[in-house]
Amino acid sequence: MIGLTGWAQSTPVKGVVLDKDSKEPLAYCVVVWKGTRAGTLADENGFFTIGRIPTQDTLKVSFIGFEDAFVVVKNNVDLTILLKGLDMERLNIYDQHGTQHMHGKDPQLFQTVTEKELCKAACCNLSESFETNASVDGSYTDGITGTRQIKMLGLDGKYAQLMGDNIPNMRGLNTVYGLGWVPGPWIREIAISKGAGSVLPGYESIAGQINVAHKGPEMKEKFFLNAYAGNQGRYELNTVSRHEAGEHFHWDWMTHYAKNNGRFDMNHDGFLDNPVGDEYNGRLHAALNNDNGFNGDYSIQGLQYLNQAGTSGHLDIPNVVMNNNQWKWNVDAKNGWVFEPDAADEKEQSIGTQVSFSQQLSKWNWEGVKNYSGRQQTLRLVFLHAIQLNEDSKLTYGWNYLDDQYKEYFSPMGSWDRHERVQGGMAEWAWNHHDEIQIIAGARAEWHNLFGFLLTPRLHTRFTLAEGLHLKWMTGLGRRTANVIMDQPGFLASSRVMSIQALTNQPQYPLGLPMEEAWNKGVVLSYDTKLFYRKAGITVDAFQTNFKQQVVMDWDQSGLLKVYPLQGKSVSTTAQAEAFFSPLKRFEIRMAYRWVENMVDYEDGRRSLPFVSKNRFFTNLSYSTKMFEGDKRWLFDLTAKWNDGQRLPNLLGSQWEGQQPEVSPAFWIINGQVSLAREERWDVYLGVENLFNFKQNRMVLYSDGSDGTMNLDANFAYAPAFGRMSYVGLRWRLAE
């Protein structure tokens, strides 16, 4: 530790320290007289003043990530000192707060979850990757199929725009299932944006945007392997390999295999807690670039998902077998050209294109009761042009074409086919005034062959009130087409009959139902500071989503799922406070509280949405030891979540009246993990989820039907069925 002492002399030395490449100031760098303990710190703008000493005329200037500079002071001229950055690929720096962080200076409420954060839990796939995140909730769609879904801002995940590498590809028939088809070990980072978000990816964002960035050429290792085994009978093997063919061409190959063979009924309701089956998934990705500003990104992915759910055989009840088989493949191509200005009056520009095609096949069978099959084919074409208008502003505009073809068959209701074609333009203007005021304004204007002209405006603003203190305000419109079966796949795991009340004056609408449309507005106050000389911060946000049109799913009807257009108001209001700080070196605490009120005008009155916790507390503790034996360390992570009671569907008048409470009990979920890591080589991890073994005992309601089949309803899942789950895993990396 260097003791820094100010020396007052009659002719102090003054100067500024800059990054040699970017010419940006280097804040708080160390300036000392060479060979002494006499020195000072530069201020936030890189300026420094240091008193002279009679025994030395050479200054040593140091900053993390840069080479030291030695400057001989010969006169009283103010100094400009340029530091050269080190080769960061050769540095091994442990970033104490780099695993999950808010972007305070972004006009959106934008959060990044890195690969290191995902390693704090098992995170077998994207649907399980939010266990250590306070903004996104994970839950189950029903008590039989084991399908996981997410919620944002008190709304189902179908109202969030889900993307892979900035391409919306978890939508339509795979809005729910698609989350489980992104293996966690393939993920480099996840970007989460609350609110309507940017207009450039599309109009389907209402509650937020989630973008998954896959691993690629930037990987440090040549080969990565992840193996996982859990006591629930689940086993996984994942690989990622990186290859080079010359300086400008890189490609990587990803594989995933998962097997579930545990036939457990830990809550003793007569049904398997998780389905049994297999998943095969593979992805080939290639990246091409040259010295003229061109970058190409291409990928092809295919998967097969086969599972079976139903009765466990532990109780004397009629046998139920539900088969769920899914196939999906997609091809994506992105090209970009960056044009550097050749003259002083030229503007920096870039052009980008996206071409994406995907096909999904879905087959669901509950023999004698329900059969569903669906096929979705999607083609997306995008052209974007970005130009730097001046030092403060940038304009991005472009053209978009979307072609969606759906063929669905649901027994006993028949065939549902639709063909959606959307084309139009979009533009987004970004203005940044001295990094103190920032505005992003955008809009889309498109023509939809079924719903007509669509105008989608959005606005995000940020004001810096003081150093580290930012106020944000945002608003925007979002819309989507409802998929009444695959938006609520838990409906298939019940004897409920679907009743659709169509709009008689709009025969061109799919099933006679309108496009869902909502305004989202939010305000955010964030503060980044230092506590105990370490990074700390707090973010407080409030959002309200007001639906102008909505397809209401009414579960409060005996034996029915009623589907009808909103006739009144539907408003979701949320408020959240999240703070993090580090009381000790390598020890971080993250805490959050969230409040939700979600009210809907159903056809028989206003009430809250089911399966929404009004209050939720969240705490995550992370600690890592010092390195020992050169490059090893222990990592400890603990996450605690308290969920308030949730309103359950109404059973009045049904054969199961009184068998479920009106509101579920509140409960804690405690997860923990211990890892032994050898830096950049391997990790061995051991974890437990639901430490206190809380489980929902009555998740499925059933009775014998008059025709020998079973009447059942599994749409009451508010908590885990399996209880405590432990797992062990290995992450192994092969360096260059």
Enumerate the predicted regions with their spans:
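C-terminal beta-signal and adjacent terminal beta-strands/loops
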Residues: 642-651, 674-736
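Membrane-embedded beta-barrel scaffold of Gram-negative outer-membrane proteins
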Residues: 249, 350-364, 464, 470-472, ...
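N-terminal periplasmic accessory domains that precede
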Residues: 76-82, 126-129, 148-151, 163, ...
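Short, acidic, small-residue-rich periplasmic hinge/interaction motif at the N-terminus
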Residues: 18-22, 29-34, 62-66, 74-119, ...
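Gram-negative outer-membrane beta-barrel transporters
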Residues: 432-435, 538-547, 565-649
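Flexible loop and strand-edge segments within Gram-negative outer membrane beta-barrel domains
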Residues: 260-281, 287-351, 356-377
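Extracytoplasmic beta-strand/coil segments of soluble accessory domains associated
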Residues: 51, 127-171
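Short acidic/polar hinge/loop motifs at secondary-structure boundaries
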Residues: 48-51, 167-194, 282
